[in-house]
Regions:
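Conserved NTP/Mg2+-binding pocket subregion across the NTase superfamily
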Residues: 63-166, 170-174
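Conserved nucleotidyltransferase catalytic core and NTase-mimicking acidic/glycine-rich helix/loop elements
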Residues: 132, 136-270
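Residue-level preference for alpha-helix termini and adjacent loops
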Residues: 38, 110-113, 202
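Glycine-rich, flexible loop/turn motifs
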Residues: 35, 128, 199
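Surface-exposed loop/turn and secondary-structure junction residues enriched for glycine/proline
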Residues: 42, 64, 114-117, 186-188, ...
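Short amphipathic alpha-helical segments, especially helix-boundary/capping motifs
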Residues: 7-8, 20, 55-57, 127-132, ...
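Short aromatic-enriched loop/helix-cap "lid" or pocket-rim segments at secondary-structure transitions
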Residues: 36-37, 105-107, 196
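Metal-dependent nucleotidyltransferase catalytic core
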Residues: 1-21, 26-39, 44-94, 99-101
Length: 270
């Protein structure tokens, strides 16, 4: 597998050959807190003068190495080329017209400039707090709790009808996301605005390992019985955390509605 130094040299040399105006990198490789491993992508942008000329003949992409798989994506005025190479490295390369550089900057939480002789990035600053969580207001908390318990009824319906994809989608995509949000707010109460990462990937760094194990145990959706078990455990987890959060902040928690919704689920699924 090519080293980071080799890959960055290749990225910069290719940019030089193509007469790219500026090069920057975003993603986990620009975050000192991110764990270092072989799965970190090279999220790179080439700021270019002539986008149409570059995409007219993409043979130059071969210079990055032999690809296992690739994907091309159109993003507003930009072109994104996702490439996984045989040696395990991956480059997510964005081609961005110079006049639309702000479009790329606004799409990224943080970035590091690798080459910018014209100073094109000078007017722009990274916004690393994009995935940070601030302390919740009482309205935020109330809306989150209402969303959790309301959508839990959809999960009950899906399980009862044996519509398992529907049930799982609402359980993980809504209820468990509200649980993760609540856990992030728990941290923010003590620490202020905190970096939980995209998709909460750093959240459990702020908790004892048992908390992550408790959440991970919810993620078996392989059959109807296990989805049902996950729903009840998710309800218990959320109810426990919401009460603790309410006690800590003084925010009102509608415990009566929560317990009625748990009874509703028990009556229909037990």
């Amino acid at each position: 597998m090519r080293t980071e130094t080799e890959m960055l040299d290749l990225i910069l040399q290719t940019a030089k050959v193509l007469q790219v105006n500026a090069v920057a990198m975003s993603g986990s490789r620009t975050n000192p807190k991110a764990p270092k491993d072989e799965f970190q992508d090279y999220d790179v942008v080439y700021i270019v003068e002539d986008l149409d000329g570059l995409i007219a003949d993409l043979a130059w992409l071969e210079g990055f190495g032999k690809r296992i798989i690739e994907q091309y994506v159109l993003l507003d005025h930009r072109r994104l080329y996702l490439m996984l190479f045989e040696d395990g490295n991956r480059i997510d390369l964005t081609l961005c017209p110079k006049e639309h550089i702000k479009e790329w900057v606004d799409s990224e939480a943080d970035f590091t400039v690798l080459d910018d002789p014209q100073g094109l990035f000078a007017p722009y600053a990274p916004t690393p707090k994009r995935y940070w969580t601030a302390p919740a207001s009482e309205t935020d908390f109330d809306k989150s709790c209402n969303e959790f318990w309301w959508v839990s009824a959809y999960v009950v319906k899906g399980i009862h009808r044996n519509h398992l994809i529907y049930a799982t989608d609402h359980l993980y995509g809504n209820c468990q996301q509200e649980l993760l949000k609540l856990l992030a707010w728990q941290v923010a109460v003590d620490k202020g605005t905190v970096d939980v990462g995209k998709n909460y990937k750093y959240l459990f760094q702020y908790f004892p390992s048992e908390k992550e194990k408790e959440f991970t145990a919810l993620l078996d959706f392989s059959d109807q019985k296990k989805i049902t078990k996950s729903l009840f455990a998710t309800m218990d987890f959320f109810h426990k955390e919401a009460q603790a959060f309410s006690l800590k902040t003084g925010f009102h928690y509608d415990k009566e509605t929560a317990e009625k919704m748990m009874e509703y689920a028990e009556e229909r699924l037990k």
